[in-house]
Design a protein with these regions (language model features):
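Well-ordered beta-strand positions
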Residues: 27, 33, 128, 172-173
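ATP-dependent NMP and nucleoside kinases share a basic, alpha-helical "lid"
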Residues: 95-105, 109-146
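Glycine-rich phosphate-binding loop of ATP-dependent small-molecule kinases
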Residues: 1-64, 75, 190-203
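Hydrophobic "anchor" residues on beta-strands that sit immediately upstream
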Residues: 3, 26-28, 108-109, 123, ...
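ATP-dependent small-molecule kinase phosphotransfer cores
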Residues: 36-108
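Small-molecule kinase domains that catalyze NTP-dependent phosphoryl transfer to phosphate-bearing small molecules
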Residues: 95, 124-125, 142-145, 149-196
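An amphipathic alpha-helix signature
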Residues: 24, 46-50, 136-141, 151, ...
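Residue-level signal for inorganic ion chemistry
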Residues: 13, 32, 83, 111, ...
Length: 203
């Protein structure tokens, strides 16, 4: 089973690429979705996060107010690292369970969608890594359109991520989401075929 990693800085268009890959029949583990589940009502990280950061970050439904917590941790690197020390091991366990299930199902390939793939060492378990890029102007425009995003918060997030040039140097495939979507999608499909995956192209 081929393990493909997908990464890129915030708002580069990873979700679009992941959606295309999923449409092609490749199962995906989305680390952001895993985090949302862990911090949601009844999630596995809720109790420890509340113990470490305070009950005021809890919601009436039994989860974590991710926006308030995000505002808190991204303004203080030490707090961000503390949160990551709680959440990242749980995400890895979630991912490992997914991989084991896909191996048992004899999947030809899977995709690991991880914004901090290189930063967390997740690339070591991947056979291939796709890096998605976009211009600074494009990423800023997309990110600042998100609810609750500010320029200061965006700067803090970008500072916690590996620079794009370093990611490019470690990529097996680089996709530029500033290019026309059809061009990028065809580049992706061609590459998947090159690495030995049978892909049906829908024209």
């Amino acid at each position: 089973m081929k393990i493909i990693g997908l990464t890129g800085s915030i708002a580069t268009g990873k979700s679009t690429i992941a959606g295309w890959i999923n449409e092609l029949g490749i199962a995906i583990h989305d680390s952001d979705c895993a985090v949302h589940e862990l911090l949601g009502p009844g999630g596995g990280a809720v109790e420890e996060v509340l113990a470490q950061f305070g009950c005021h970050f809890g919601t009436i439904t039994g989860g974590i107010n991710r926006k308030s917590l995000g505002d808190e941790v991204f303004s203080t690197p030490q707090k961000r690292l503390k949160l990551e020390s709680i959440v990242h091991p749980m995400v890895r366990q979630h991912r490992d369970t997914f991989i084991a299930e896909q191996r048992r199902a004899r999947a030809a390939a899977i995709l690991l969608d991880v914004p901090l793939l290189f930063e967390t060492g997740g690339d070591a378990m991947c056979d291939y890594v796709i890096v998605v890029l976009a211009s600074a102007r494009t990423t800023a425009k997309r990110a600042l359109a998100r609810p609750g995003m500010t320029e200061d918060k965006l700067s803090s997030i970008l500072a916690s991520q590996m620079p794009s040039d370093e990611k490019k140097a470690r990529a097996d495939l680089i996709l530029d989401s500033d290019l026309p979507k059809d061009q990028t999608r065809n580049q992706l499909i061609d590459w998947l075929s090159v690495i030995g995956l049978s892909i049906v192209r829908n024209e």
